[in-house]
UniProtKB/Swiss-Prot annotation:
UniProt KW Cell membrane keyword: yes
Database matches in InterPro entries: AA-Vitamin_Transporters, EamA_dom
Protein name: Uncharacterized protein HI_0976
The organism of origin for this protein: Haemophilus influenzae (strain ATCC 51907 / DSM 11121 / KW20 / Rd)
GO cellular component terms listed in the entry, alphabetical order: plasma membrane
Entry membrane topology: Multi-pass membrane protein
Transmembrane segments: 5-25, 27-47, 60-80, 87-107
Localization (cell): Cell membrane
Length: 128
């Protein structure tokens, strides 16, 4: 639980720090520095597991990794130029809730009790 709280604090402060760095450097450079630090940490694990992945799936994984991490971080930090850090964190925090609603209304997926409880909790927390 302690590591989850620590990860939440680091993640939630990243957009606030990103907004402050606009006066010092370009947002693309901020994203590159973040990803280089993450690459240094994850590279030993990556090299160990990479050979076990099927070759046809590797190209799909590269595209998924690019769009899921690089493009999303870049778009979030570029979006900070046009809005405040608090509204950006609010929009990003609502993403899990929107995924549940899109899945329910467009794809007719059924949610379990925990999902319903967490949606109600998010709606209640959003009111305050």
């Amino acid at each position: 639980m302690l590591y989850q709280i620590l990860a939440l604090l680091i993640w939630s402060s990243s957009l606030i720090v990103g907004k402050l760095t606009y006066s010092m450097m370009d947002p693309v450079l901020v994203v590159q520095v973040r990803l280089i630090i993450a690459m240094i940490i994850v590279m030993p694990l990556f090299l160990r597991r990479w050979k076990k992945i099927d070759k046809p799936m590797r190209k799909q994984l590269w595209w998924l990794a690019f769009f899921n991490y690089t493009a999303v971080f870049l778009l979030q930090f570029i979006g900070l130029k046009y809005t405040s850090a608090s509204s950006a964190v609010t929009m990003i925090g609502l993403e899990p809730l929107l995924v549940v609603f899109v899945g329910h209304f467009f794809f007719k997926t059924k949610q379990n009790g925990f999902t319903g409880y967490s949606v109600q909790w998010h709606l209640l927390a959003w009111q305050f």
